[in-house]
Amino acid sequence: MADQALSSAIPETSNTTTTTTTNGHGEERTESVSEQVPELPAYLHAALKQLAPKEGFTEGNFTIEFDFGSSKGDGFVGQMFKATISEGDRREVYLCKIPPLDDARREQFSSMAAFAREVLVYDRFLPTIYEYQRAKGVLSRDDGFFHTPRCYHAHCDETAQESVIIMEDLRLREFQLWNKHNIIDYAHGALFMTHLGRLHAISLAMKRDQPERFAPFKLPNPFDPMLKADGPFRNMILSQLQMVIDALHEQDTIERAKMEQLKEDVFDELMRCGKAELAEPYAVVGHGDCWTNNMMFRYEEGIPKEIVLFDWQVMRYVTPVQDLMYFIFCCTDGEFRRKYYHEMIDIYYASLSTMLTKLQHDASELLPRAVLDEQLLVFGRYGILMGMFLVPMMCTRNDELPDIEALAQKMTETQQLDESFFKTTESNQEAYATRIRSVVQDCIRYGYL
């Protein structure tokens, strides 16, 4: 399954329709306009009421209003709501991410495990790597990796099926999402590669300097259990691969043969690409879901100057190649790669090397360029393994995506995965075929297939 399928994105626009209002004592009223905000769990109200005094609001004198915070198709395992805390003339906006309210959706997409992982990121991993950088003298956002949303509260109780992550609304600081339907351009790609290099460098340095402190973040691939078990997930993978093959031209004999060969051992390949031990001693903590809906940009005179990464629900300890291939093959097209593929890798490695120097290490020891090139050959096919899921979704308008809760309910009743979420529609078939064909061709061209 595409990693996006296990994530919730901060939306391009809010579906502002209704609000549910509560005061500091929990008294509620609902205002109906068109589509009503559902009844939200008590633990979310409690978390916000706990946060409000810390943010300077007076106990009993503030109100909390809720609005929708994400759009259809933004993610399987989480729902986003916008909370506005008000007192007098003061209004503060927060984004609240919680597991799906629908029981079937929460169960079928393993929401609680994903939230536990993301809470670990905001509660422990990010504070730890920020502290580590500062201890090494890397203090400025311009010099290191500090580019994540401010998190005010992160909690997960898997037994109680409760979790909430309260973050800043980046739009209030003029951050914007890249339109997922557009191919990323050079400036945005270079900015992402720069910060990805910094993120990976921190892993390489910290596991050398503080191995015991770093150890809790060596999380395995979250998809391994589904890959090992017979069932709808495996059937869906085969269906996606067949869709790629069907998009190839009849004369694409080499491409067809390579994909048919991949189909024979695709489950083993997906697991192999996620095995950290095969990448050691060069494995890193990867973001795991590096596509444009999980990053936002701030601009100056139309030029992207700052990037923020979010949605860490599938973070894992793995080869650095995974994040690279995920972004390059899902967010760019054949034309971009012909022009800039090698330059993107160069930008990434230069940034990683510079960051390691700041952390008082040497890239030639911790990740030599020759080793990176070798790992690209070993793990590079991850580009098509993720592209076969994400490319059709990136070519599909949100209003054409199927209903996630209906999908989950059907899975509960039939134990079969409705494959329609990853299918193309009549309106996007041509765009999908062009993009996925170039992914296959480029994976072959670079020696990854």
PLM segments and residue spans:
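Low-complexity, intrinsically disordered regulatory regions enriched for serine/threonine
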Residues: 4-25
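Generic recognition of stable, solvent-exposed alpha-helical segments in well-folded globular domains
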Residues: 117, 187, 191-194, 239, ...
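Juxta-kinase regulatory segment immediately upstream of eukaryotic protein kinase catalytic domains
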Residues: 11-12, 24-69
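Active-site acidic catalytic loop and adjacent metal/ATP-binding pocket
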Residues: 72-87, 95, 263-320
